[in-house]
A protein has these predicted regions:
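Structural beta-alpha unit
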Residues: 7-18, 22, 62-65, 91, ...
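Gly/Ser-rich helix-loop-strand patches that form or flank binding pockets
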Residues: 1-16, 129-181
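Short, conserved glycine- and acidic-residue-centered signature motifs
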Residues: 37, 93, 158-162
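General small-molecule cofactor/ligand-binding pocket signal
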Residues: 56-58, 119-123, 174
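A short acidic, glycine-rich active-site loop
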Residues: 78-96
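Residue-level marker for beta-strand->alpha-helix junctions and adjacent short loops that shape enzyme
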Residues: 6-7, 34, 62, 125, ...
Length: 200
């Protein structure tokens, strides 16, 4: 797993694992560079300001090749082209992260986002699994994420990653639609509580 508290750090490219402070007074915001992610950032930053917490923007990228999962004999056949493919994926992830980071900074400067302390984490793996693993390791107070990812179909009410996180998370999860008409939780005038009376 590659994990970094700074998206654009050379430590990520070099494969090092920077230390991350364990402070559970955080709002976790999983991002995937879609419009849903930016809306989730807006809500997450405002919520973090309201509860005097920090925000953590987490992106999980997936590489199709894991040398450690290959049969022992096949590890020696691991081709340079595969390593180059992984590096290309990392470069693309960094470019996307840089673009999102610039958007967040612009919105902070313009006053659209509150000027709070935030950090960025990059992990390799399956998104829902790494989000839940991060929650287990660092115990943030709440998760704020988009209802759908950028690759979801228009008719999907909620994406598979978000649905899995909601189902399995032991901390509260706010799923934010991209077209929600307000910017803060404090602007909500009515709350609908939907339940099947399951004990969870």
């Amino acid at each position: 797993i590659t994990e970094s508290s700074s998206w654009l750090s050379e430590e990520v490219v070099g494969g090092k694992t920077p230390k991350i402070e364990k402070n559970n007074n955080k709002v976790l915001i999983p991002v995937d560079f879609s419009g849903y992610s930016l809306k989730a950032c807006e809500f997450g930053f405002n919520l973090a300001q309201n509860i005097d917490a920090e925000a953590v923007l987490l992106h999980v990228y997936f590489t199709p090749i894991y040398a450690t999962s290959l049969p022992y004999g096949d590890i020696f056949n691991y081709q340079l082209s595969d390593e180059e493919n992984v590096r290309n994926i990392l470069q693309k992830v960094h470019a996307d992260l840089k673009a999102l980071s610039a958007k967040v900074k612009e919105k902070v400067i313009s006053g659209e986002f509150p000027d709070i302390k935030y950090s960025c984490v990059l992990r390799e793996g399956i998104p829902e699994e790494e989000i839940l693993r991060y929650v287990k390791e660092y115990r943030p107070r709440i998760i704020v994420m988009g209802t759908r990812g950028k690759n979801q179909k228009d008719f999907d009410l909620i994406g598979s990653v978000t649905a899995e996180v909601i189902e399995r998370s032991h901390i509260p999860v706010f799923a934010i639609p991209e077209n929600i008409p307000f910017k803060r939780f404090t602007e909500a005038k009515r709350i609908a509580f939907i339940t099947n009376f399951d004990q969870r």
